[in-house]
Amino acid sequence: MKVTFEELKGAFYRVLRSRNIAEDTADACAEMFARTTESGVYSHGVNRFPRFIQQLDNGDIIPDAKPQRVTSLGAIEQWDAQRAIGNLTAKKMMDRAIELASDHGIGLVALRNANHWMRGGSYGWQAAEKGYIGICWTNSIAVMPPWGAKECRIGTNPLIVAIPSTPITMVDMSMSMFSYGMLEVNRLAGRELPVDGGFDDNGQLTKEPGVIEKNRRILPMGYWKGSGLSIVLDMIATLLSNGSSVAEVTQENSDEYGVSQIFIAIEVDKLIDGATRDAKLQRIMDFITTAERADDNVAIRLPGHEFTKLLDDNRRHGITIDDSVWAKIQAL
């Protein structure tokens, strides 16, 4: 089914206000969920909203909490999220990293006791739109086996790197081949994954998203490489924030809350003039996209460039929502 941005935001706002969330907080949160969905990231927008409400109802998320700065060391700050709403807090933290970068050239905010930030790419994009390089990542509850194991002991720990090119170039990726959100998107659409994404009941690689969801055995991105990256990203976020590691979140909490996150902004224009920056970025992009295609019908992709078209399509033709997901939201 198709809905407009206003209909989608209104549905989110209604549910939030029914939980006695303050009007301004409900409006800002509904706006972010709707923008994420409108951008084409359904897995961490509309599809994730019922799960968000479940955690809100369970008390994992404290909607009126205010993040507090704990430590300030020039370009580096450490904050405690106080388990406030994840996407609103993450936006504030990237804004703060940008402010620090304006003063120091680089800004780093380490956040502890945070909630799921929904679409991590929103915060990298937020920096790149203002002309900064944006880098951020989060740890999570253990939802992926480390390479060589059957049990989930590491997080998907998504990493975002956004570059202020035209259009914005951005990598937004979990350390698994597919996030659980993307497994759900493909399952709801009745699609196999384009490549192996996890293991079946017999320990064999499979493209069946439903089987992987059931078994909780997703495949690390790049096999041992994604597993290794997940571990070191967790270590850095834990140390810089003085927060909880994947092990602590998994073993000490009843659900995924109290995670640790990093937000970095770099003001490129302090290091290179605008014309030179743009020329260098354009040369990189041209060099890549003019390569001979492996398939004449498949364009060479630059990460993040597809979001401009997705956003335009959704604004022109309406936002496609899975009927079952929409029914869940209407029932909340």
From Swiss-Prot:
The active site is at H44 (proton donor). InterPro entries: Diketo_gul_Rdtase, Mal/L-sulf/L-lact_DH-like_ah, Mal/L-sulf/L-lact_DH-like_NADP, Mal/L-sulfo/L-lacto_DH-like_sf, Malate/L-lactate_DH-like. Its EC number is 1.1.1.130. It is an enzyme of class 1 (oxidoreductase). Keywords: Cytoplasm, NAD, Oxidoreductase. Disulfide bonds: none annotated. This is 2,3-diketo-L-gulonate reductase. Homodimer. The keyword Oxidoreductase applies. It comes from the Bacteria. GO terms for cellular component: cytoplasm. GO terms for molecular function: 3-dehydro-L-gulonate 2-dehydrogenase activity; NAD+ binding. It catalyses: 3-dehydro-L-gulonate + NAD(+) = 2,3-dioxo-L-gulonate + NADH + H(+); 3-dehydro-L-gulonate + NADP(+) = 2,3-dioxo-L-gulonate + NADPH + H(+). Gene3D superfamilies: 1.10.1530.10, Hypothetical oxidoreductase yiak, domain 2, Hypothetical oxidoreductase yiak, domain 3. It comes from Salmonella schwarzengrund (strain CVM19633). NCBIfam families: PRK13260.1. It is found in: Cytoplasm. Catalyzes the reduction of 2,3-diketo-L-gulonate in the presence of NADH, to form 3-keto-L-gulonate.
